A protein has these predicted regions:
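Residue-level detector of intrinsically disordered/flexible regions characterized by low predicted structural confidence
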Residues: 6-9, 233
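N-terminal secretory signal peptides that target proteins for export/translocation
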Residues: 1-4
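Boundary at the C-terminal end of the N-terminal hydrophobic targeting segment
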Residues: 19-24
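Extracellular/periplasmic carbohydrate-active domains that bind, remodel
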Residues: 25-496
Length: 496
């Protein structure tokens, strides 16, 4: 057995890492939010739940840097939910005029309201909500319940982090199978993760993984990076304060992300970036990211691509080759993203593209998701739901179904268009076909009209199905009305 601990870095190479040593508690590192008091009623009495701080950024205040910061709160707790759970939130700053508990589609309204508090019921742990007083979305409160985890893993392959603070630094996992990192309720793990060639890797629990002490400057890295990690599973944890992308997953098959929570404030704090992955299931997540919530990308390192992008000195003209060099497959296919709640303070909530490098994208389905916020509407990157047809890629069989978009502060509900954003050599996408929008409900007044735009006769979109796309309850029935623009390079459009 080999265990090396040096300079704040944990190397895990087919070894058993002993349970982490806890120092203090999570409150030492993630200070208490002083704006809110949260209590739950159980056992005949009110029990106070600790409220943590998290930073978020206001795109309207600083759209380029994204560093106009605010402090929101989040409360994590577990309950059996054998019966509905009553929650009381007190606004310590004083009185308020109105309160919203979102998603509004949950139908949660206060049972009791005083000048500075509200009480309401949660029917099950899937009802994770944002409590917003007087329309304040920057300094709001997330209530994040879960069921207790009764299946805590044990064994030589388990790295266990118990309640308290764990200064893990960089956790590197390589060339092994079956490793489990378990963050128990009350655990706060400080650091980031790099994993490569680690099959059947699981990261789960009810704790918090926080990267607040990692470099957020020029050398910032993703919070968790996975390369060639087949059958990866991430479940139950909350990821806070990523320096860059939150989850960067490259060249991995059979990925399952379930019930994760994310709060990120910095530019590029994408929630999940999938690069050359296939057979992916994302479900039951609750995400607030400054940048994209979920984005699906590709780069290229096929022998043909490498040969055509190698300079005379042996270097690559496309530096992204290094990210995906040595992968077995590059096709992007078989994605299902379902039952998630998405909040993007700047960018997209559900994005396919634009990075493609000539790779084929197919069989991608987003369904039964809720959008709480979206803002960007700059002519290049709009769309709570978007397909950016770029970078010599091909895109087919992409569906968005049963999506609720609440009263977002700006942006568009949907966009599919040709672009050369983030493309190598300025290439647009080749073509797109079979795009479906079904049961899309937007309620609000601030979103601008959606787009579906081909580029020319050759670079076109062929086969668009639109069924029950409504704006404030009114069906969208054509592509020339006030809510949807479809241009002449989009063919075979069907309104159901």
């Amino acid at each position: 057995m080999l265990l090396k601990i040096a300079q704040g870095v944990f190397w895990i190479l087919a070894v058993c890492l002993m349970p982490g040593t806890a120092h203090g508690n999570g409150r030492d590192v993630l200070p208490e939010n002083t704006a809110y008091k949260v209590e739950v009623f159980r056992g005949g009495t009110w029990e106070e739940i600790f409220v943590y701080n998290a930073r978020v950024s206001d795109y309207a205040g600083n759209p380029e840097a994204g560093y106009t910061q605010y402090t929101m709160g989040f409360a994590l707790f577990t309950d059996s939910f054998r019966q509905p759970l009553k929650v009381r939130v007190t606004r310590r700053a004083g009185t308020f005029s109105k309160v919203e508990i979102r998603p509004l589609s949950y139908g949660i309204v206060p049972d009791v309201q005083t000048p500075n508090s509200v009480e309401f019921e949660l029917g099950d742990p899937a009802q994770k909500v944002s409590v917003e007083f007087d329309g304040n979305r920057m300094e709001n409160l997330f209530i994040l319940p879960d069921l207790p985890d009764t299946a805590i893993p044990m064994g030589a392959n388990v790295t266990y982090f118990g309640p308290g603070v764990h200064n893990a630094g960089v956790i590197r996992i390589a060339n092994e199978s079956g490793r489990i990192l378990y963050l128990d309720e009350g655990a706060v793990v400080l650091g980031r993760i790099e994993a490569e060639n680690a099959a059947n890797l699981t990261i789960r629990g009810r704790g918090v993984f926080c990267s607040s002490q990692e470099d957020h400057g020029a050398g910032r890295r993703p919070q968790m990076e996975f390369r060639n990690c087949d059958n990866l599973k991430i479940e139950g944890i909350l990821l806070r304060d990523t320096p860059n992308w939150t989850l960067k997953i490259v060249g991995s098959t059979g990925v399952h992300i379930d019930n994760s929570k994310e709060i990120g404030w910095i530019m590029n704090s994408d929630g999940m970036d999938f690069i050359c992955c296939r057979d992916v299931l994302v479900e039951n997540t609750f995400q607030r990211n400054y940048d994209d919530n979920v984005t699906i990308k590709a780069f290229n390192a096929t022998p043909e691509y490498i040969a055509s992008h190698t300079n005379t000195d042996g270097s690559y003209s496309d530096g992204a080759i290094w990210m995906v060099a040595g992968l077995r497959d590059f096709e992007v296919c078989n994605y299902e993203i379902r039952n998630c709640v998405f909040w993007a303070d700047k960018a997209h909530n559900m994005l396919v593209g634009p990075e493609a490098r000539g790779i084929a994208f197919r069989n991608i389905r987003f369904h039964d998701n809720i959008v709480l916020e979206n803002r960007q509407d700059d002519g290049i990157y709009p769309g709570a739901m978007a397909v950016m047809i770029a970078d010599d890629g091909t895109f087919e069989d992409i569906a968005f179904e049963n999506i609720i978009v609440e009263d977002i502060d700006g942006g568009k509900v949907f966009c599919a268009h040709f672009t050369n954003a983030w493309a190598f050599d300025g290439l647009y996408g080749q073509w797109a076909r079979n795009i479906t929008l079904r049961n899309i409900a937007y309620t609000g007044t601030r979103a601008t009209p959606s787009w579906i735009r081909g580029r020319n006769d050759a670079q076109s979109i062929d086969g668009v199905t639109i069924g029950n796309f409504t704006v404030n309850g009114t069906p969208v029935t054509d592509g020339s009305g006030p809510h949807l623009e479809i241009n002449e390079y989009v063919r075979n459009v069907t309104f159901e």
